[in-house]
Amino acid sequence: MRRILSVLLENESGALSRVIGLFSQRGYNIESLTVAPTDDPTLSRMTIQTVGDEKVLEQIEKQLHKLVDVLRVSELGQGAHVEREIMLVKIQASGYGRDEVKRNTEIFRGQIIDVTPSLYTVQLAGTSGKLDAFLASIRDVAKIVEVARSGVVGLSRGDKIMR
């Protein structure tokens, strides 16, 4: 089962490697990882997407709390939350395929950010499912040349904050 963890940690040298080391030492896979400083430059927020059952997730959370740099851990899937991912995709198309790429980009509320005679580069933001659906929608009419995805970022909805 897909899980998203939000981790608030000190913005210190080595903090990221200690979290990654915890996952690799225990054989847990990280599907995606994003990390950046928060509005407080001494803190970073890390969003980790992983796969596991309730028991595995509980173990991961307990181990994360033991790390000295980690201040808070929250599973975003446990309540109302918003999540987004950004994707850049380079698409090769001609004729009808170019029209379909433009049409699908509009439908999915993306942006064409670069154009050459044979390629479009499209930027799209949304849930992972939305990005996957966009890729599926153009596979039959164009060739996907290259894809770069940011990984999931997310926050709890409403008054719940992580400080």
UniProtKB/Swiss-Prot annotation:
- Involved pathway(s): Amino-acid biosynthesis; L-isoleucine biosynthesis; L-isoleucine from 2-oxobutanoate: step 1/4; Amino-acid biosynthesis; L-valine biosynthesis; L-valine from pyruvate: step 1/4
The EC number(s) given in the record are 2.2.1.6
Q: Give the record's subunit note.
A: Dimer of large and small chains.
Tell me which family the UniProt entry assigns to this protein.
Belongs to the acetolactate synthase small subunit family.
PANTHER family associated with the record: ACETOLACTATE SYNTHASE SMALL SUBUNIT (PTHR30239), ACETOLACTATE SYNTHASE SMALL SUBUNIT 1, CHLOROPLASTIC (PTHR30239:SF0)
NCBIfam families for this protein: acolac_sm, PRK11895.1
Q: What is this protein called?
A: Acetolactate synthase isozyme 3 small subunit
Q: Give the gene name.
A: ilvH
